[in-house]
Amino acid sequence: MKLCVALDLSTKEECLQLAKELKNLDIWLKVGLRAYLRDGFKFIEELKKVDDFKIFLDLKIHDIPNTMADACEEVSKLGVDMINIHASAGKIAIQEVMTRLSKFSKRPLVLAVSALTSFDEENFFSIYRQKIEEAVINFSKISYENGLDGMVCSVFESKKIKEHTSSNFLTLTPGIRPFGETSDDQKRVANLAMARENLSDYIVVGRPIYKNENPRAVCEKILNKIHRKNISENDIEQNYEVIQQKEWDMCNHFEEWIKTQPDKEHALKEFYAKCGIKY
């Protein structure tokens, strides 16, 4: 699983400063529509000068097939590593985009947007007359069969997409709140444990990182959880009965206690050690 940091700040200078703070970390950067319209293609070049970041250009391209292919060709010339288009543009548009990009010796990954994470079931149904999961699976099959590399989806559809396509079909999941932060304008949000459980290949995290006074520390904490076998909430639930059998008075108040700990990882290590369970 890869961490993709959303550069959704108010100015180019703030975005570049954040990128500088995150140098030498194993991360991707996401440049969205706002930053691209405001700062232009030269912003991509400036980011590359800060560090050799992998860049996801998140423009969600959606138009008639030829226009989509033209747009994808142009942004691919920028040397970005991933782009996305709307799956609802249809099979012909997807085919035309992939045919156009086949001439590149090294093309970017192309993912299809399924259902925006700002949708809930009611609002999605009012437009598409389908349930979210049903539509996402349909979009995913069309995208997979016509040569795309993966899907942009919520965590809740990630595993289902792979079941209906291939384990190698990538899923990028926005709306990640790694440590239980507020969901803001996102409706279908999830944490790191859920992203891992549902086989997300890329997770997008924005506000929990760039609104923190120490964004690098937050990134490092997320990366630490990604790159090791972390004790997830599921692990805690599965071992809870075992833990309760141990004579340690914190067991009965575990959930309340862990929330009060400034260094949760260290606290969990001590907790498991006292309970005689291997960390």
Swiss-Prot record:
Belongs to the OMP decarboxylase family. Type 1 subfamily. It is an enzyme of class 4 (lyase). It holds the Pfam family OMPdecase. NCBIfam families: PRK00230.1, pyrF. GO terms for biological process: 'de novo' pyrimidine nucleobase biosynthetic process; 'de novo' UMP biosynthetic process. This is Orotidine 5'-phosphate decarboxylase. Keywords: Decarboxylase, Lyase, Pyrimidine biosynthesis. Catalyzes the decarboxylation of orotidine 5'-monophosphate (OMP) to uridine 5'-monophosphate (UMP). SUPFAM superfamilies: Ribulose-phoshate binding barrel. Gene3D superfamilies: Aldolase class I. GO terms for molecular function: orotidine-5'-phosphate decarboxylase activity. It catalyses: orotidine 5'-phosphate + H(+) = UMP + CO2. It comes from the Bacteria. Its EC number is 4.1.1.23. The keyword Phosphoprotein does not apply. One of its GO terms (cellular component) is cytosol. Homodimer.
